[in-house]
Amino acid sequence: MQRRTQELIWKELVDNSHKLFCNCMDPQNHYRLICQNLNREPGEPWRTAGGIGEGGAGGDGAAAGGEGDVHGRPAGAEDGEDGADAAMAAALAAFEDATG
């Protein structure tokens, strides 16, 4: 039950941060990455839509999961995703701290 509650909270967080920060019109891609982050091993790097971050938001500019094709732009094209991913990574860290 707790995992389901977390998933619902994350879906809402992703949708809201996506509307605020990203104009790619593809929140499902970000939601998939956040779900991967929830299931990552301790010490494993965060995954973002821009690539693999180093322990936090950001990325190396590499596309994740065919992102360029999904978004209709070349991989790494700036569309606000890094801001959306940064907001979600910060929210994820705060949520994990609060829920232990």
From Swiss-Prot:
Compositionally biased intervals (Gly residues): 50-67
Disordered, as annotated region: 42-84
Protein name: Uncharacterized ORF2 protein
Natural source organism: Torque teno tamarin virus (isolate So-TTV2)
